[in-house]
């Protein structure tokens, strides 16, 4: 029974990832005044399936001087972690109801660094290694701001459990009182998932393709799927934390539709950002976090702690 539950969570993610690639290409096409994919199938709808067949039927090529074991394990680890993170997300009910589900998600997303680092090191290519080192520094840096923002959210929520956020936001979404944190969180999720304008790990003009430059066929597709699964997961988490997914036990379907629609809107915002902004310089990327986001998030965290303490000091009004 547990296996069926696992499959019902993980299997819908794969077609969602496939069609997100199509939506991205279509959206970027229309934003750049062109059509995008429109040949394979009606309106280009079968393009992701054609891409998947092409990639998984090709033979993977291993560089002669690469570390074959790590080279193969890295993309498998990336996709496994990307799918595992979905387990505690309430949609409206989680696969595994953990007490520390928020901490679990942060820990799992931190482990993604290893797959990128291994792929860059195992490729034995200077471009791949440079991209991997950039990715590691970037991901670790923005994890700091995300963890501090999460701490503020937990103070408002009173629990690390994601299901409790639905109860907290029954009357007011946390995006309204905590909009500065929401803005910093959204920017941090862009950096965490290595998306434009923070896509320095795969800077085509400098590093050819970044950490996955030596990958082809199936392993490359696994990295691609992991990246897009992480994008959808981060947006789903943003919806749970800031935009309230009220769960009605009588009609859980309404809650699921509500949750999915909000996640789709945020995901389209991710694509919109890619179409609108140029890539950051690497020093600007680090400056933004360590000199701007970190002091602000720490100050807001202290502010939220002081609010709770000051409210607790007020005597009850008759």
From Swiss-Prot:
Disulfide bonds: none
Keyword Lyase on entry: no
Keywords: Electron transport, Membrane, Mitochondrion, Mitochondrion inner membrane, NAD, Respiratory chain, Translocase, Transmembrane, Transmembrane helix, Transport, Ubiquinone
Record localization: Mitochondrion inner membrane
E.C. no: 7.1.1.2
One GO biological process term: mitochondrial respiratory chain complex I assembly
Reaction(s) catalysed by this chain's protein: a ubiquinone + NADH + 5 H(+)(in) = a ubiquinol + NAD(+) + 4 H(+)(out)
Entry keyword Magnesium: no
Top-level EC class as recorded in UniProt: translocase
Matches recorded under Pfam families: NADHdh
Membrane topology field: Multi-pass membrane protein
Highest taxon of the lineage: Eukaryota
GO CC terms in record: mitochondrial inner membrane
TM stretches of this protein: 2-22, 69-89, 102-122, 146-166, 171-191, 222-242, 253-273, 294-314
Single annotated GO MF: NADH dehydrogenase (ubiquinone) activity
Function: Core subunit of the mitochondrial membrane respiratory chain NADH dehydrogenase (Complex I) which catalyzes electron transfer from NADH through the respiratory chain, using ubiquinone as an electron acceptor. Essential for the catalytic activity and assembly of complex I.
Subunit structure: Core subunit of respiratory chain NADH dehydrogenase (Complex I) which is composed of 45 different subunits.
Similarity-based family: Belongs to the complex I subunit 1 family.
Protein name: NADH-ubiquinone oxidoreductase chain 1
UniProt organism field: Elephas maximus (Indian elephant)
Gene: MT-ND1
């Amino acid at each position: 029974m547990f296996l069926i539950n696992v499959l019902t969570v993980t299997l819908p993610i794969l077609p969602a990832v496939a069609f997100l690639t199509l939506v991205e290409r279509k959206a970027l096409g229309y934003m750049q005044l062109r059509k995008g994919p429109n040949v394979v199938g009606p309106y280009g709808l079968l393009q992701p399936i054609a891409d998947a067949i092409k990639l998984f039927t090709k033979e993977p090529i291993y560089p002669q001087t690469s570390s074959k074991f790590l080279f193969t394990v890295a993309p498998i680890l990336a996709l496994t972690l990307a799918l595992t993170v979905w387990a505690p997300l309430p949609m409206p009910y989680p696969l595994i109801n953990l007490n520390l589900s928020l901490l679990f998600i942060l820990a799992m997303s931190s482990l993604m660094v290893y797959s990128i680092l291994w792929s860059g090191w195992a490729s034995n290519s200077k471009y791949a290694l440079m991209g991997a080192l950039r990715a590691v520094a970037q991901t670790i840096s923005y994890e700091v701001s995300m963890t501090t923002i999460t701490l503020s959210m937990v103070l408002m929520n009173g629990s690390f459990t994601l299901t409790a956020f639905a109860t907290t936001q029954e009357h007011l979404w946390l995006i309204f009182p905590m909009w500065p944190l929401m803005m910093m969180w959204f920017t941090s999720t862009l950096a965490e998932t290595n998306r434009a304008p923070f896509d320095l790990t795969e800077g085509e003009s400098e590093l050819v393709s970044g950490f996955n430059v030596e990958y082809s066929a199936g392993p490359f597709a696994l990295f691609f799927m992991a990246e897009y699964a992480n994008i959808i997961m981060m947006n789903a988490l943003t919806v749970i934390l800031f935009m309230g997914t009220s769960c009605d036990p009588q009609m859980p379907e309404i809650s699921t539709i509500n949750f999915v629609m909000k996640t789709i809107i945020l995901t389209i915002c991710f694509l919109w950002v890619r179409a609108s902004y140029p890539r950051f310089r690497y020093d600007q990327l680090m400056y933004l976090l360590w000199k701007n986001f970190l002091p602000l998030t720490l100050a807001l965290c202290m502010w939220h702690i002081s609010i709770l303490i000051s409210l607790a000091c007020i005597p009850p009004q008759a």
